[in-house]
Amino acid sequence: MKNTSGHREPRTRPRERDPDRRPHPDRDHHVERSRDRGGDRHRERNGDVRGNGDRRAGREQRTDRDQRQDRHRDAGHRASEQRALEKSRQSRARPEPWGPSWDAAPTPGPAPWGPRELSQKHGLGRRGLESERASERYVPTYSVPALQEEEYYQSEAEGLLDCHKCRYLCTGRACWQMLKALLNLLILACSSVSYNSTGGYTGITSLGGIYYYQYGGAYSGFDGADGERAQQLDVQFYQLKLPTVTAAMAYSGALMTFSCLTLLAGALRVPWHCPLWLVIEGLMDALIAGAYVPGLYFFFQHLSAAYSSDVCKERETLYQSKGYSGFNCGVHGGDIGAGVFAAMAIGVFAVGAVLAFRGYRKVKKLKEKPTEMLEF
């Protein structure tokens, strides 16, 4: 029913917009409609401007809209500044060979509806950028030798021993050095058999006790003049072999000591700090391998001279007359064992020389490697 009095009743004022409510992302992108334009006095008088026609309410809505637009414009300006800073930093940054850096992906710009805390995050990003630019994430120069040394030992020594000092014992050079020491120890043991006893029943009965009665003067058949003659022949034959046996023991003992010293030097990283040590070790191994050949020749030559002497033949005849057949004039097991181990040592020392020279080349290559290849 229409009002006949001609007085128009005021319309109820709409509810105010909540300032904490998140606006729709496309709120400000609508095309302004004709009924929302300012200056339409007729529609404002009739109360047709999104509310009750109140001019104050329209001004408040326009002010709120302008503040949101200014906020979006400031956020977009900060995002463009951040992207420009990222591009300039990437153009100045040094290329890294080992994979992408942490700032490979560009920082996404802030959303138009994002909160105010984005400015603080961008500030933190700038501070992190300055700290990264100062250090540039490159390995310091003083740590490069340690990395090279670690690479040298890790490439060869990945095995049972994890100790940093004992890791060298798993390398090929260390195994050959231990084998050289073992072979020289066996040569020393075989040579000491002839050195410690004069041989014959005199040497057996010198142990005393039951050995004297079982093998010695009581039941040996040597009594009187034959016993004294057998003892003299044993001592003379021992003196004939003594120089050769002594030289073999001294030679093998010195080489065993040398092998242990090279093993200890490798465990203490002397070859890394002084590569010339590897050259000296390789030359010594080659010299020792070559010296074994004439050493074996003179060893068996002097033994053959001792076994072919008149003393050895008379001694053999005397023992055979008493029924003993183990005293013939020929090389025994200890002499043969020393010769076999010496022949094996020739090949081992030759291979050790090759490994030493290869180790020298490897150390020189690692020390001359440019630092850019070790940067992460």
Curated annotation (Swiss-Prot):
Residues 1-173, 269-275, 357-376 are cytoplasmic. GO terms for molecular function: mitogen-activated protein kinase kinase kinase binding. The keyword Transmembrane applies. GO terms for cellular component: bicellular tight junction; membrane. Residues 1-134 are annotated as: Disordered. As a component of tight junctions, plays a role in paracellular ion conductivity. This is MARVEL domain-containing protein 3. It comes from Mus musculus.
